[in-house]
Each structure stands twice: as structure tokens, then as C-alpha cells.
Amino acid sequence: MAVHQGTAQALPLPDASVDVVHARWAYYFGPGCEPGLAELDRVVRRDGTAYVIDNDASRSTFGSWFRRGYPEVDPTAVERFWSTRGWTRIPVDMRWSFTSRADLESVVRIEFTREVADAVLAEHEGTEVDYAVNLWWKRF
């Protein structure tokens, strides 16, 4: 195994040189990530597989926060984007669990603007948040 530094739209790899790709929050929100997906088409070998994990804004507490923070991202359009390009969706339920409220608040403030973070934190109690993601996969 080797690790290379690069960007999704300019992978430092030869054509048809990769068997498995795993990308987590690298191809944000579907539309707009076409250059990165074109790179996957280039570098993944025939019968190779790519896996992409992305937020599922259509469900979960975090999903409702995400819709507030990023109202321009349409969950239905994102799903259509991936599925019309031959990707298969596996919904995954997970959870953020923190040892302190301060830790939860710190992470929420990384994810959202001050206004959105303040609002969702004021409405949410505790140190856990249910979080839904989509695992998108495609065989090449």
C-alpha cells in the first residue's frame, strides 16, 4: 500500500492503477464533483470498486441541521446525481458521541456558521447526535 497526496480532480496515479478507492467527504454533495469522478473513471481498474461516504441530509438530527446550514444542497438532487451515474446507495446510521458538551459544541461549530451552530445547540440537549450518511459505491 502507498499513500499519495493529491486532490480528487488530479490524482497522482497512472491510468487503471487502482483496485479500490475509499473517499470520505471528498466529493461533496454530488453536483460539482464531476472532475473528481472523472479521475476515478481514469484511475480505477476494470472491475475495481469505489466507495464514497457523504452526508445524508434527508434524515437524522444532523441531517436536519445540515439542511439549515446548507439550504442550497437538495438531498433529492444529490441522490439523483449519484444514481444516474451508476452509483448504488447504502444508507448508514451512525452517531456522534462526546464525553463532554464542550466537545460536541466545538465540533458543531466547525461544521456550521456561528448563527446555525448557536441555533441547533440551543435546541439540542446532551452529548450525542444521531447522524445519517450515504455509502455510495460503484464497480468500474
Residue ranges of predicted features:
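A short SAM/SAH-binding and catalytic strip from SAM-dependent methyltransferases
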Residues: D19-E34, D56
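Conserved class I S-adenosyl-L-methionine
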Residues: T49-F81
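Short, hinge-like loop/turn segments at secondary-structure boundaries
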Residues: H22, R68-P71, V107-V108
